[in-house]
Amino acid sequence: MNKLTTLTLSLLLCFSCSKNEDVDTIDIPVTTTPRPIAQLLPNLSQLNLFEGPLKDLTPSPYSFTYTLNTPLFTDYAHKSRFIVLPEGETLTAVGNGMPEFPDNSIIVKSFYYNFDENDLSQGRKIIETRLLIKQNGTWIAGDYHWNEAQTEAVLENNAATVPVSFIDKNGTTVAVNYQIPSNLDCITCHSNNDQVKPLGPKLRSINYNNQLQNLINNNQITGISNISTITTLPNWEDDASYSLQDRARAYLDVNCASCHQPGGYCDVQTTLDFRYETLFENTSILEKKSEINSRMVNYQELFSMPLLGTTFVHTEGYFLIKSYLNTL
């Protein structure tokens, strides 16, 4: 919960009436919200990342929210995302990919489940809030685990399993043993050539619904002279606007390419390169299509792909990839 610093200004209004003097005092509260702290402190509430009750997940006014056109699948968990930049600093565009962040930037992502997708008034359960903080040119990762009362989240390095039950949009009750990753797990996916890096907010992934234009308008990003030169990663669910191939490649990029690319965790284990911009003939998708299918069709711990972040098959995602592989 954000701490509000309240300054009380007392205005003395003096009125003279005959020989009597009446003095009225008016208290006017002026509130200032403290800036977020770019450190991994023990409790999430200490970082000033949210204002109001912590469980509301209302971002600090010093931040900006963003969404991704094709997000990572994490056992149907919802995600709340925002970025905090240090005062007076901006992002710097680098092609269509990840922008350059100034030191003391914070990337915040909270994971939660609505108890009933058809009745949001039933509330939600927040599981974890992940942070990436840039300090002295290097990104550090931290994961805050939420308590049952939803009043605080505590910095943890170890993995944890959190049982969750929710009702999906079809009215079906779904039980999930949500896996909170360890700090080492986080680094596994976020590391490339032994350097921790952000994954989500690439320019091509936020270039829709005027998000990128709003960043330009708000002076939160520099280096874009013509927004039309920034490409857009396809929305894997939008079959009206994008081809099966483009949607499948986008899904593989977001869910698999962090490890399956040069310098990634699986670089020395396989020739697969799932980055969207990689030419098809250089991806090894055709040669490995049988293996790709076998790793996605059923969930087997330590065998299924993605290796981390899921505990069962993403039915809709698998159907997309299976349909795509059948065309090859």
Model-predicted regions and their roles:
Residues 4, 36, 241-243:
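Generic hydrophobic alpha-helical membrane-segment signal
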Residues 9, 99, 109, 164-166:
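Short acidic-hydrophobic surface loop/beta-edge motif
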Residues 18-26, 30, 117-328:
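Sequence context surrounding c-type heme c attachment/ligation sites in exported
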